[in-house]
Amino acid sequence: MEGVAMKLPSFPNAISIGHRSFSRVRCSSSLSVCSAAAASSATISTDSESVSLGHRVRKDFRILHQEVNGSKLVYLDSAATSQKPAAVLDALQNYYEFYNSNVHRGIHYLSAKATDEFELARKKVARFINASDSREIVFTRNATEAINLVAYSWGLSNLKPGDEVILTVAEHHSCIVPWQIVSQKTGAVLKFVTLNEDEVPDINKLRELISPKTKLVAVHHVSNVLASSLPIEEIVVWAHDVGAKVLVDACQSVPHMVVDVQKLNADFLVASSHKMCGPTGIGFLYGKSDLLHSMPPFLGGGEMISDVFLDHSTYAEPPSRFEAGTPAIGEAIALGAAVDYLSGIGMPKIHEYEVEIGKYLYEKLSSLPDVRIYGPRPSESVHRGALCSFNVEGLHPTDLATFLDQQHGVAIRSGHHCAQPLHRYLGVNASARASLYFYNTKDDVDAFIVALADTVSFFNSFK
């Protein structure tokens, strides 16, 4: 992580720096947003927001009902990982308490029960993204492993010197580094799409880059920094016109909106459980059936074989071919519970609510002086994801995030968000990021804005 401007302790009400002592003030009169946000929060508590989706579901998330550093927890880091509802935690505990056993290996009751629930989770994931067959879902350790699976299994087998892989400068490291490794091994060339004036990947340039040399387009669906989304259906058409495949990093879209893989028509799509109310340690790869059948194994070991001889082995059909060894059984079952939970609320409802609260976050944050938000401005035609990456002039984002946590119990992300090339392109080393999920409320946003104003006021007092 980037260097920190100063290491902040747990601050008392009066702080001494050098030979001067300063008293902390929660809100500076120079930042009128404090009183405005506080008034807004009071109105929200008694108005229609009191029955918002965020308020209705918060009871399901035990972790949100606690104090951190003497303040009520305000969790605004769901783009890094989401919190887990009780139903998911209970599903994980029930597996270990009542039918813990290995899958696909035993005929006894516990093994049969575990196998049934494990495969049921696969079917739930397939239905959730509208895959035509559950065998198109490969369970992986996370989305990073899913991308590496495609890179090593499909990429090493299909790319040759001079072939081109198109990405954008806004990709997560997980969608850059594997293709760097594969390009070094195969001689393939990586082509990067830069941003346009709205700070979104330039789709016109992407289309211009696609040529008969293009073998793969690997792009995000929603950016974890810019909050922008890409027109995947159009990109797929352009790529398929020249015989290229498309891999979609859907980690920031599957948890937040309806994702239909048959409608998108992408060849591969990856997502991660822990960003969609599920546990860590499991993600999934969607791959078109014919492609998965054409790909060699990624890892060797138990379960992925058909027959093993001393001089050779034959391999199982997908998805087993790509799931060597004992899988994350309880985690897969809990992911299935997360899918049930999200489906019970309804992804259209979740997306609609997040568009509203995400716009509210953008408007409140942009009203603060000296704040620079990255990515496009929201409009009738541009719906940002419910996150804002930003910087405050003169403040290091890590100092800012530390103060918010220690003094206000507000949890946000600071750093490069696994997107160093993008930050370099934007001309900064790091940014702060506040990211929302459907369990957040406008009250959370207001608390964050008040806390941020106090943070800026505190640091400005030393200038």
From Swiss-Prot:
Gene behind the chain: NFS2
Regulation: The cysteine desulfurase activity is stimulated over 40-fold upon complex formation with SUFE1.
Biotechnology: NFS2-overexpressing transgenic plants have enhanced ability to tolerate and accumulate Se and may be used in phytoremediation.
GO biological process: cysteine metabolic process; iron incorporation into metallo-sulfur cluster; response to selenium ion; selenium compound metabolic process; sulfur compound metabolic process
Subcellular location(s) of the protein: Plastid, Chloroplast; Plastid, Chloroplast stroma
Family named by the database record: Belongs to the class-V pyridoxal-phosphate-dependent aminotransferase family.
Transit peptide boundaries: 1-35
Subunit structure: Heterotetramer with SUFE1. Interacts with QS. Interacts with SUFE1.
List of residues that carry N6-(pyridoxal phosphate)lysine: K275
Tissue expression as described in the entry: Ubiquitous.
A GO CC annotation given for this chain: chloroplast
Species of the source: Arabidopsis thaliana (Mouse-ear cress)
Pfam families recorded: Aminotran_5 (PF00266)
Key word Ribonucleoprotein present: no
Protein name, per record: Cysteine desulfurase 1, chloroplastic
Function recorded in the entry: Catalyzes the removal of elemental sulfur and selenium atoms from L-cysteine, L-cystine, L-selenocysteine, and L-selenocystine to produce L-alanine. Supplies the inorganic sulfur for iron-sulfur (Fe-S) clusters. Required for the maturation of all plastidic Fe-S proteins and, thus, essential for plant growth.
Cofactor(s) recorded in Swiss-Prot or TrEMBL: pyridoxal 5'-phosphate
EC number: 2.8.1.7, 4.4.1.16
